[in-house]
């Protein structure tokens, strides 16, 4: 679906979303000490992830099967991943609370974006999607939105409340709405230097 207009109400897509939402709901109903149960649910929800991430419930996924987590990565409460197309999250990625990754996009022109009426009387619209990549060793603080088409470079930190609409180069501290690079992360940022 990357970059192509599609109907999100397609019956096959509806079934995939329903499955992911049911699995996420089951996961969200578990307690933190039910590790084995959580692991089994995540294996089904995220079938393309080899090592299951540490996810604090609640979590929400559009499909799950389009999200790939690397080793030792995780997300705090209220992680939302609208994974219409691939979302790659690298190794050692920390995701703070209330972070949304949104790959779906809608056309800018109203005549392309507006709802349409099918012959059977049902309504639909069209959308497209762009992938998201978060490279290894990144930290996304709280209340961040990452939009489709973005790559966050290795070792970068995204400040709380940011809306990331453009790619961020490696080893950058970036903040704001829209998110902008403030400076490069260097050896001077080591805790022992503070």
Label for each model-derived stretch:
Residues 1-51, 108-111, 178-194:
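Terminal amphipathic alpha-helical/low-complexity segments used for targeting or macromolecular assembly
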């Amino acid at each position: 679906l990357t970059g192509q207009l599609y109907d999100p109400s397609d019956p096959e897509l509806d079934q995939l979303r329903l499955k992911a939402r049911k699995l996420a709901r089951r996961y969200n109903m578990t307690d933190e000490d039910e590790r084995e149960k959580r692991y089994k649910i995540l294996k089904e929800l995220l079938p393309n992830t080899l090592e299951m991430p540490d996810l604090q419930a609640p979590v929400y996924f559009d499909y799950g099967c389009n999200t790939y987590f690397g080793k030792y990565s995780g997300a705090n409460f209220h992680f939302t991943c609208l994974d219409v197309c691939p979302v790659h999250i690298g190794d050692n990625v920390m995701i703070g609370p209330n972070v949304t990754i949104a790959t779906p996009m809608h056309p800018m022109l109203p005549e392309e974006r507006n709802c349409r009426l099918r012959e059977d009387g049902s309504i639909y619209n069209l959308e497209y999607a762009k992938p998201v990549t978060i490279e290894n060793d990144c930290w996304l603080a709280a209340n961040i939105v990452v939009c489709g088409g973005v790559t966050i470079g290795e070792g970068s930190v995204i400040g709380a409340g940011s809306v990331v609409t453009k790619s961020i180069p490696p080893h950058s501290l970036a903040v704001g709405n829209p998110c902008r690079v403030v400076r490069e992360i260097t050896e001077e940022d080591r805790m022992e230097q503070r």
